[in-house]
């Protein structure tokens, strides 16, 4: 009993327990850093410091650069390497329809009523329930769309039925509304993978916090760099390249070195749809996420394609 009591005292000292829940900690940190920025004073956090790792003389991976560029609540001259815990600004958020109801409940629990103004774009999908439009889906999905529409998200189905339901899957829509390689995307689906920026699949609570605060907290993952050489044959589809990557990785290492890491592709000439084919496959390889660095000309072409698709969405209401 004494041993258990001593263990309990350790847990009581944890911040989220002292605060009465994780939401209080998240909002407390956000308010504190925001107040210091407005008042132009140095941040002296009342909270326990996050784990910060900096290796002198070591360069930065693409994901480390993205995380440092979007980091919140750290000093300007501090640069972090993989393994560091960091709060980051989230640019794009996706909520999918099977977990969306839980996300809406989380938002209600934290008394959030409108999407964070720092989020560039957010989408509530209807693609998972669209194929099985049973009585439960017919009851829950319109209610979910009404809530998310009012909250400030683009919704796959219009609560007022003034436009046709969108059949595009969540990943494709998020790809189209992501505009640059420096974006951080959070989506309520394990296959949240983007052709631009770096995207992470997340639980309903993390999605809710990203929508409400425009931020997420996570460790900076380690990376594995993938380099392509030569020219793809005319008879080949890009999916052949994807399968060849897996085969070569297993032949070279004998084990799945992608698991839990970021896969970085520095080819630069992959258009959005090809890049998505690759990044979507990385979910099957149990990678944490994937990054496809684009050359400027390639990024412009991808954005033109995305612009046409978004225009179709606008034209349909």
Residue ranges and their predicted role:
Residues 43, 75-83, 116-120, 154-162, ...:
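Flexible, glycine/charged-enriched surface loops at secondary-structure junctions
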Residues 46-120, 264-266, 270-276, 289:
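N-terminal amphipathic, basic-rich helices that act as targeting or association modules
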Residues 1-7, 11:
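Single conserved hydrophobic/aromatic residue that forms the stacking wall/gate
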Residues 135-137, 271-279, 304-309:
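Short glycine/threonine-rich loop-to-helix capping motif typified by GTGT followed
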Residues 9-12, 16-17, 303-317:
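Phosphate/diphosphate-binding glycine-rich loops and adjacent basic-rich segments that engage nucleotide
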Residues 12-20, 24-44, 182, 186-299:
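Mobile "lid/hinge" segments at catalytic clefts and subdomain interfaces of large enzymes
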Residues 30, 35, 67-74, 110-115, ...:
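Structural signal for hydrophobic packing residues in well-ordered secondary-structure cores
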Residues 81-219:
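Long, structured ligand/cofactor-binding scaffold of large enzymes
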